[in-house]
Every structure is written in C-alpha cells, then in structure tokens.
Amino acid sequence: MAKLSGMKDTWTVTAVKPKYQTYVVVIGESARRDALGAFGGHWDNTPFASSVNGLIFADYIAASGSTQKSLGLTLNRVVDGKPQFQDNFVTLANRAGFQTWWFSN
C-alpha cells in the first residue's frame, strides 16, 4: 500500500466543463440488477434510485466474477489486462479539479 500511495498518476486533462456543482457516484457492487427495481427488477424496492434525476448504467456487466477483481478492472485504467492502480476514477477526478470523497461500508 505504501508503494501504491507513492505512485503518481499519468492523467492528462485537456478540458473540464462541469455541468453540475455536485456529482455523486454510487457503486452497487455485489448486487444483481434483476433484484433492484431501478435496474429493471420486478420489485419496487429502490424508490430513490428509481426517481432520482441522474444517469443510471443499467446494462453494465461486471468485468470479472469476483467483486475485488471486477472493481479493480472497472475503476482503474487497464493496460494489457493489468489495472494501473495510480490511474483510477478518483485520481482522474482530482486531476480535473474536483474534490472527491470515498465512503464505504
């Protein structure tokens, strides 16, 4: 972890034109879309996600069969099948001038 935290990202941001002041990204890992109403499931069990004014990626397919590997391949830039952990979704947002927070349970 110490080695990873010392690695610098390689992002080059050419333009940032944010439409909104605040962006919220919710990652519903370990959940099947057919069990959630907002994603086409049969139950009305996601009232907030079903009504929120946002972009929902309902057709995403996990990059791997395990959560850890799937998120590593999804949230990081991948070169030759290997995640570049320093070049990830959060470092890209930071490089673009956004403040970021990570909440996890």
Please provide the spans of the model-predicted regions:
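Active-site-proximal alpha/beta segments of enzymes that process anionic O-linked groups
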Residues: M1-V25, S30-N105
